């Protein structure tokens, strides 16, 4: 149900962006068991400037993002989710922030100039609390570490290996880049609750996962090697 909305949104984005950029799209299907891959092929498979990638199994959103980055043939690569929780037009402000000394620009709804719309209070509290902990560990002091809406320098991220599945892997990507010396900046952004579908995030499991990742990244920082 999200794909027709995504197609219409990306058509508008391409029209807005093509005056400044050579826009190309990579669509990654993360081993779906429904008709997602067929619909993606129908909508985008034959379009100029579009590439489709299918993962053999569901490996999590971070693995899907990395697959898309590796499949891209440009040095600047942007990642968005298919239900457009963030407005892709915000990339017009984010892409110029990827200057020569920056390896990643992440959307930041928890930035003082950012905004969240219709997001449950428990999710806000959880996300801000986790950001506080990551801020104490990592070199790049950010307000938001959990957004998957980002702009990457391909050469800085394509060799990153993640071990976590789900959205936890998105944080692991950022953490591993941070501990490898990458400079990461954030752009104030507007976050809305998922427009299509229901979030499957389980609070207790999410907290345990983040605490485990924080522990491993702490060991990595102390020991100076992967954990």
Can you name each region flagged by the protein language model?
Residues 1-5, 34-42:
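Acidic helix N-cap motif at the loop->helix transition within catalytic regions
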Residues 14, 18-31, 53-55:
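Short beta-strand/loop segment that forms part of the nucleotide-sugar
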Residues 29-38, 84:
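A conserved acidic beta->alpha catalytic loop
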Residues 51-71, 76, 88-167, 193-204, ...:
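Acceptor/aglycone-binding surface of glycosyltransferases and processive sugar-polymer synthases
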């Amino acid at each position: 149900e999200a794909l027709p909305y995504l197609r219409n949104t990306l058509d508008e984005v391409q029209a807005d962006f093509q005056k400044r950029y050579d826009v190309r799209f990579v669509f990654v299907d993360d081993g779906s068991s429904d008709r997602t891959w067929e619909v993606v092929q129908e909508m985008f498979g034959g379009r100029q400037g579009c590439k489709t990638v299918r993962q053999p199994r569901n490996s999590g959103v971070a693995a899907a993002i990395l697959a898309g980055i590796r499949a891209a043939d440009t040095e600047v690569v942007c990642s968005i989710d298919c239900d457009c929780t963030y407005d892709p037009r915000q990339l017009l402000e984010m892409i110029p922030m990827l200057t020569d000394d920056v390896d990643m620009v992440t959307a930041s709804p928890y930035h003082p100039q950012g905004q969240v719309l219709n997001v449950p209070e428990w999710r806000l509290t959880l996300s801000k609390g986790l950001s506080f902990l990551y801020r104490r560990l990592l070199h790049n002091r950010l307000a938001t570490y959990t957004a998957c809406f980002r702009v990457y320098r391909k050469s800085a991220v394509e060799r990153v290996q993640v071990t976590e599945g789900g959205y936890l892997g998105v944080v692991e990507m950022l953490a591993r880049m941070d501990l490898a010396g990458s400079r990461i900046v954030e752009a104030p952004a507007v976050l809305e609750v998922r427009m299509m579908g229901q979030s499957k995030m389980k609070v207790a499991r999410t907290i345990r996962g983040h605490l485990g990742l924080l522990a491993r990244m702490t060991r990595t920082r102390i020991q100076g090697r992967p954990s």
